[in-house]
Amino acid sequence: MSSSNRELVIDFVSYKLSQRGHCWSELEEEDENRTDTAAEAEMDSVLNGSPSWHPPAGHVVNGATVHRSSLEVHEIVRASDVRQALRDAGDEFELRYRRAFSDLTSQLHITPGTAYQSFEQVVNELFHDGVNWGRIVAFFSFGGALCVESVDKEMRVLVGRIVSWMTTYLTDHLDPWIQENGGWERFVDLYGNNAAAELRKGQETFNKWLLTGATVAGVLLLGSLLSRK
């Protein structure tokens, strides 16, 4: 698949923002305007004799070189299938754990100065004893909720940063596991065609299927982690 991890993150975040009446393209345009303004100021500094500016050597995200993602390695599955499966799984995750998930995001009390620390704390706890597909779904859902919370609290500037943090973590920490466990093809096999919702309607044991090793107790643990100030 030719889609990058960043494109997958943006699609999911854009979808979550749209559910709350927000528009990703508007946020992206604002971010680009801020970037252009900063670049102009930096170029002015160069023209005024500053030796500190250097053109970027390559594509980086938050200082980390972007490697080939598992989406690029596994080219059989269609990008649209992965995106739709991830959207559906995220919706089902949030439906099942709406209260715990709402408590989690509301307890963050994020600010531009503390957002990364909060993101890192929750994500590290989520994957502290391993990776599985359910936790990857939870990771995307958390990042999407954090973006929505940022916009709701008039901190729109954080959305682009959160997307970059998610992309970096997905590329650096989750891609190896994804590649070793069937790639995104396997994810689509498990979660495609709104499989999570169908299992719930069929009264299957949803917890064991979606959040293997990351059950409700694990979600609540994240909430208790954030309540320890």
Curated annotation (Swiss-Prot):
Q: Where is this motif: BH4?
A: 4-24
**Where does it mainly reside?**
mitochondrion
Motif BH2 in this chain: where? 176-191
Motif BH1 covers 125-144
What tissues harbor this protein? Highest expression in organs with lymphoid development.
GO cellular component terms given for this protein? Bcl-2 family protein complex; centrosome; cytosol; endoplasmic reticulum; mitochondrial matrix; mitochondrial outer membrane; nuclear membrane; synaptic vesicle membrane
Task: Give the matching InterPro entries.
Answer: Apop_reg_BclX, Bcl-2-like_sf, Bcl-2_BH1-3, Bcl-2_fam, Bcl2-like, Bcl2/BclX, Bcl2_BH1_motif_CS, Bcl2_BH2_motif_CS
UniProt xrefs under CDD domains: Bcl-2_like (cd06845)
Please cite one Gene Ontology biological process associated with this protein: neuron apoptotic process
Mind telling me which SUPFAM superfamilies this protein's record contains? Bcl-2 inhibitors of programmed cell death
Keywords linked to the UniProt accession: Apoptosis, Cytoplasm, Cytoplasmic vesicle, Cytoskeleton, Membrane, Mitochondrion, Nucleus, Synapse, Transmembrane, Transmembrane helix
Claim: rRNA processing is one of the keywords in the record: no
- Motif BH3, residue numbers: 82-96
Q: Name one GO molecular function term.
A: channel activity
Q: How does it sit in the membrane?
A: Single-pass membrane protein
Membrane-spanning residues = 206-223
Q: What does this protein do?
A: Dominant regulator of apoptotic cell death. The long form displays cell death repressor activity, whereas the short isoform promotes apoptosis. Also acts as a regulator of G2 checkpoint and progression to cytokinesis during mitosis.
The domain-related comment in the record is: The BH4 motif seems to be involved in the anti-apoptotic function. Intact BH1 and BH2 motifs are required for anti-apoptotic activity.
Q: Which family does it belong to?
A: Belongs to the Bcl-2 family.
- NCBIfam families, per this entry? bcl-2
Which protein are we looking at?
Answer: Bcl-2-like protein 1
